[in-house]
């Protein structure tokens, strides 16, 4: 069971892949715990009913070591065309992949003792991941970790003006 999990409403999923953008070596993170930057691709945007079709992460240890992993997941349900159009993953691509239940214990072990981070992760990725753990019957404690939503940081750091948008685009 997932304990003390912060639920959020009205998720919005943004296409984002962290694996293609590793941390710069000159970037110094002062980490107490390892942090896992992760992204999910899913069958849709409903936290309660949609399923993971891909999980990828970059795990950064306090000593600076990094490890990455990408897994395709059979969601055991049809992937709607609209979702496939976003992430490019179709039913045939995951037909022979393991289900989340089959990999849940390994994923839980990979993120054990880690803080979690991602883009829009507090509103979408973390709730979806928690729901998948619940369905798989894997107990994971979400109370002893920090959640870092890069989207929140981005919105605080970037100017939200017409002039800034003009310069950006």
Each model region followed by its residue ranges:
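Residue-identity detector for glutamine
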Residues: 13-15, 151, 159
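Conserved non-catalytic scaffold segment of RNase H-like nuclease domains
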Residues: 24-144, 159-169
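Arg/Gly-rich low-complexity intrinsically disordered repeat tracts
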Residues: 5, 11-22
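Positively charged N-terminal leader segments that act as targeting/secretion signals
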Residues: 1-8, 26
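Intrinsic-disorder/low-complexity regions
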Residues: 3-4, 17, 29, 148
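A short, structured active-site edge motif that brings together acidic residues
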Residues: 142-154
């Amino acid at each position: 069971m997932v304990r003390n999990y912060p639920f959020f409403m009205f998720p919005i999923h943004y296409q984002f892949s962290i694996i293609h953008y590793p941390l710069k070596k000159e970037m110094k993170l002062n980490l107490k715990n390892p942090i896992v930057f992760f992204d999910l691709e899913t069958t849709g945007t409903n936290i309660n009913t949609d399923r993971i079709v891909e999980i990828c992460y970059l795990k950064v240890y306090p000593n600076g070591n990094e490890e990455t992993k990408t897994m395709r997941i059979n969601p055991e349900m049809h992937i709607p065309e609209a979702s496939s159009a976003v992430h490019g993953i179709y039913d045939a691509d995951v037909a022979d992949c393991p289900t989340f239940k089959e990999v849940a214990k390994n994923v839980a072990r990979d993120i054990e003792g880690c803080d979690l981070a991602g883009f829009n992760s507090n509103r979408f990725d973390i709730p979806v991941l928690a729901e998948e753990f619940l369905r798989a019957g894997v107990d994971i404690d979400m109370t002893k970790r920090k959640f870092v939503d890069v989207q929140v940081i981005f919105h605080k750091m970037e100017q939200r003006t017409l002039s800034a948008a003009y310069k950006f685009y």
